[in-house]
Amino acid sequence: MAAEALLSSLLGLLFLGLLLPAHLTGGVGSLNLEELSEMRYGIQILPLPVMGGQSQASDVVVVSSKYKQRYECRLPAGAIHFQREREEETPAYQGPGIPELLSPMRDAPCLLKTKDWWTYEFCYGRHIQQYHMEDSEIKGDVLYLGYYQSAFNWDDETAKASKQHRLKRYHSQTYGNGSKCDLNGKPREAEVRFLCDEGAGISGDYIDRVDEPFSCSYVLSIRTSRLCPHPLLRPPASAAPQAILCHPALQPDEYMAYLQRQAESKQHEEKVTEEVQDTDHQVWSGSKAAGAPPKKEDVSPTKEDKESEFWKMLQEPEEQATGTEEAQAGEQDLNHEAAADPAPAPPTDFQNNVQVKLIRSPADLIRLIEELKGAEKGKPSVRQEQPGDDTTEAPQREAEAKGKGGEPRGLVEEEDGDEEEEDEDEDEQQLLGEFEKELEGMLLPSDRERLRSEVKAGMERELENIIQETEKELDPEGLRKESEREQAILALTSTLDKLIKRLQESQSPELVQKYKKRRVVPQKPPPSPHPTEEEPEHRVRVRVTKLRHGGPNQDLTVLEMNRENPQLKQIEGLVTEVLEREGLTAEGKIEIKIVRPGAEGKEEDTRWLTDEDTRNLKEIFFNILVQGAEEANKERQRQSELESNYRRVWGSPGGEDTGDLDEFDF
C-alpha cells in the first residue's frame, strides 16, 4: 500500500511537471489518459545524482518532492511509442463480428444477481428488471431499469475516434425508457458492458457487478467467454510495469563537489587496500622465515617416534591374542563335556572377549553368581581359579549329599532347591547387570541380536537336557506325572524369558535406533485408524460459513455450507490443484474471510459464493501458499530503499540531509 501511495503521489507530480513551461522541464509533454488506462508504471528513485538542466530530451521531466529536492525523471520507451504502436495495430481477424458472437445469449436464460436488498434480472436484447425476493417469490413492485435501444457500432468513425471501448476492451449496449425515477422524475436507464472472461465457459455467463454512478443511471458488467475469440476484446498479455527512473538533479557546483568526494573516497579505499596487502605480505614473509628451520630439524625424530608407536601397536594385539588363546585352551580341556554338547558355539567374532559357560546344574549357577560377585568387589582371581573350583567343588557337594544317608535323596534335592530359589531371587539382578554391562561394552547392536538368539536357543536345549537327566536320576514316581513336569518346564522357561526380556529392554536406545536404521527389512505400514473413501481428496477440508441478519429482531445467524454442496467440492478441488502443482502438503489451517452482503432465504435457495468469488479464491490460495512470503520480503526491501532515497536531500557539499521521518507518511 505504501508503494502504491508513493507511486500515485509521484505520478501526480510527474503529470504536473508535464504542464510546466518548456524552459523548466526541458521539453514539452501532454497528458495521455489512454496511455494511463492501458499501461502500468513503477516509480524508481535512484541514489545516483545527475547534473540538472543538461538533458533536453522530450522523454525527461523535472519534478520536485515535498522536501524541495528536484528530480529528473525519464519516461520509459514504451510510453513514448505507445500512441504510434496503437495506431499501427491492425488485428488480422476474419471470424464473426461481435454482435454475431453475442447472439446466442438471446435464447439463453436471463441472468440474475442479488445485491443487498435488490435482485437484478438481465434479459439479452429485451429488458433489465429490479425487484425484491423473499422465499423464491417476488415481493413488491418490479422496476424496469430500461428496454433495449442500441448497441455500440465498431465500424462507425465517431466510435473509433473515442477509443474508449478499444482501450477498456468491452462491448456495450444501451437500455433506456425504464420506470420513472422518484428522485429526478426521469426514466431509468442503464448501460450493459460485455467483457471477455475465459473462465466463464464452465460456469456460464454471469453479472459481475451492478453500479449506480448517478441517480437512476446504472452500469451492468457482464462476463462471458463468447467475446474472447475477438482480438479487440481479448485481454492483453500481462506485462511488467514500465519503470520511470528518477535521478536527483543537482546544480553544477553541487554536482562537481559530489564528483570530487567520490574521487577522494575511491583514492582512500585504494590506499587502504594497498596498506592491507603490504601488511599481509610482511606478516607472511616473517612467519615463513621463522617457521622453516624447526620443520627441518624435527623431521627425523617425528618419523622415528611414529615408527616405534606403530610397531608397539602391532605387538600388543599379538600378545593379547596369545594370552586369550591359552586361556581358552585350558578352559576347553577342563570342560570337555561342554565341548561335546550340541549347544551352538558363540560367534567367531567374540572368541577374544566373550566366555561362554554351560550351566548343567543349580550348583553351577550358584558358583557362577559367586564368581561374578567376586569380580565386582575387585577380585580378578576368581575367574582364573574357576576351572579348578569346578573340578573340586562338584565332588565335594556330591559326597555331602551321599553322606546324609538318613534322609531320602528326593528330600535332599528339595531342600537344595529351596535354598537355590532364595539365592536366585537375590542374585538374579546382579547376574543380569554384569552380563548386560559386558555385552554393552563389547558388542554392537547387530552382534547382540545374533548372540542373544544363539544363547537363548542353547539355554533352552540345556534346560531340556537337565529335565531329562533329572527324570532319570529321580525316583520313577518323582517327576513322572505330567503336571509336575509341566510346572518345572514353566518355571525354568519363565526365568529364561525374564532374563532375555530384561536384556532386550536394557539396550541403549541410541544404539538400537542406529541398528534399526541399518537394517533393510520391509515393514508393512500401520493401518490408518479411520480410513477414508478417497484419501487424496479428503486431505484438504474446506469449511464455508455465512453470517446473515434475519427474523423480526434482525438477529445475526451463522449458516454453514452443506458438505454435499457442489460449490464446496469445487473450492476443495481448486485448493488441491494448487497444492499438487506446487508440491505442497495440506498442513495447518488457513482462514479466508470474504465480506459481502448475504441474501435472504433458505440455504438451498441462496448462492453462497458468486462465480467471481470462486474463481478469485484460486488466486488467493496461490498468493498465500506460494508467493506470499517471498514476494512480501522483496516488496518490503524495495519499499525501504525507495523511502530512503526519497528522504535524502542533496544540499551544499557535505551537507546532505534526510527529511523529517515524523512528517513523512506514506
Swiss-Prot record:
Glycans are attached at residue 177. Intramolecular disulfide bonds. Residues 263-281, 294-310, 370-379, 395-412, 434-449, 631-646 have a biased composition (Basic and acidic residues). Its main location: endoplasmic reticulum. GO terms for biological process: endoplasmic reticulum unfolded protein response; ERAD pathway; negative regulation of retrograde protein transport, ER to cytosol; protein retention in ER lumen; protein targeting; protein ubiquitination; response to endoplasmic reticulum stress; retrograde protein transport, ER to cytosol. One of its GO terms (cellular component) is endoplasmic reticulum lumen. Keywords: Disulfide bond, Endoplasmic reticulum, Glycoprotein, Lectin, Signal. GO terms for molecular function: carbohydrate binding; glycosylation-dependent protein binding; protease binding. Residues 108-230 form the MRH domain. Component of the HRD1 complex, which comprises at least SYNV1/HRD1, DERL1/2, FAM8A1, HERPUD1/HERP, OS9, SEL1L and UBE2J1. FAM8A1 is stabilized by interaction with SYNV1, which prevents its proteasomal degradation. OS9 and UBE2J1 recruitment to the complex may be mediated by SEL1L. Through this complex, may interact with ERLEC1 and HSPA5. Interacts (via C-terminus) with CPNE6 (via second C2 domain); this interaction occurs in a calcium-dependent manner in vitro. Interacts with CREB3. This is Protein OS-9. It comes from Rattus norvegicus (Rat).
